[in-house]
């Protein structure tokens, strides 16, 4: 996760970054940490409902400049890499770690199952292409198909998905001037965009399904500050063809950090930036995990008064927590939610996902 340790040898996320697609769907080795996050809700032909999460992480160990020096390139001749270039050197050297999470929420059986992977990045076990989307980790993969759609596959235990995702909107870039601020100071930010309305069709556990998904792609070299405990992130897809992304960085005293922000994505794909003072998030209940002992908010009232948005989010299951001892070693809650409320005084319904970190221990303390 982006809260993990930062190395100043990697590039900081700075204002002025110009996104370019499909280039920026690919990997960015010059930044230390990067993730591709897929979440969605699906309905099978027989009415069975599912939530899913598939996430690919890349954590840099050796920055590209050091790899190129090791390959014999003189420091005076090391121009910046383009987004579609990879550094020279032996591809089997340990440059990056590749981690992945896969989770299924089975609403009918009230069951939540998750799986994790950790590998060194190498040509045949786990890698991330530059310049276009193609990331994989031991058989789990997100890749661009010839017609421009994405294919997402993962299988573990008794669970398997094989999904086709087609975007109905352009990428939504979050933040301002190319950066999403997470902490005070130079480089305390990430480059962050989302694909907020992905039409999905495919197979989940042998059942043909359809639905909506959301993809986040974020890259940077920062970590949470010592006084920051974690974050609460919300993705909301409404039936009026608008979407809402909010994140609240939590301080250790439980109050929202001033770097918290969000975005409203309109029906035509325009992105409206939301500052911390425009958002309201009110927890409605609490749930204590029997696995980690962490106590999480459970149910939320989310509002943006300036846009006349007021919605209530309810989890499809309380138990949607991942305790990832074999990969990222971060305990977090990532779960499917239902959404109902009003937008500009008109009733709306929808779906979403919520992510909560730092409730078992502050992430800002991780080094």
Listing of model-derived features with the role each one plays in the protein:
Residues 1-367:
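Structured soluble/peripheral alpha/beta segments that form catalytic or ligand/cofactor-binding pockets
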